[in-house]
Amino acid sequence: MGTGAASAIFAANRARGKVAFDVRLEDGVTRRGQLHESGSLRVRFPSPEADGLSAVFVNTAGGVAGGDRFDIDITAGEGARLTLTTAAAEKVYRAPGEAAQLSISLKAASGAHLGWLPQETILFDRARISRRIDIDLAENASLLLCEIVVFGRSAMGERMLGGEFVDRWRLRRGGRLVFAETVRLDGDIGEKLAKPAVANGGVAIGTALIVPGDEAVVERIREASESFGGEAGISAWNGFAMARFCAQDAARLRADMMTVLGRASGSALPRLWLN
């Protein structure tokens, strides 16, 4: 088989998926508005909970491979409350060529609350993924966001000897850009993570973003940080708080993240996090 035919087959096998929907407050209850689903990305809405509406993303492709593309576009209307999570940890497989692309857009209107709480993203050795998260909040909207990335299947002793991870975050509040960050790791990622100035040997990293956030939020988290299983840093500026973690044990980092989310919000975590 020629390289052209092989490339055509590879392109045809790439997964595509998109979910876009909005929620709105009606008679004191958050309800789903318009919903669009396509490809291998789906969303399910469990039974309503006391604290707004919950949504669970399901990737029917079973993971993310090279060349895949997934797009998520979510809007919470005035006063609505929405928590988003995933049905399971997302696996990103070895990619011999093009990186997978993931684009996430989150918008919250006045008085709305968004919780973006996916379970872990696990990168297999030589996985390649480029992710972008764009968040646009009204001045008095609130956000609780977390992301955990595990480099290599640590339970199997796998290291990332190669691969690519690009992560772009942009946060706007009241129309102003208040936070922008791009993380890029490629080549022998395991070797880079071993450096003290990067992750000091950690194989998992996590970030929690709390808006609004101040020193009171930081102190609540710091009170619990002595029991954390890895390294952590917590700070607040520009009206939001952020906690960052790295650990050699992905399960321990997940437990630390659950502690932080509980102290930051006081609300119950999605039930899938408790399995």
Where are these regions (language model features)?
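Structural motif
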Residues: 81-83, 113-115, 142-144, 206-207, ...
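A short, polar/proline- and glycine-enriched secondary-structure boundary/capping micro-motif
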Residues: 41-45, 93-98, 126-128, 154-158, ...
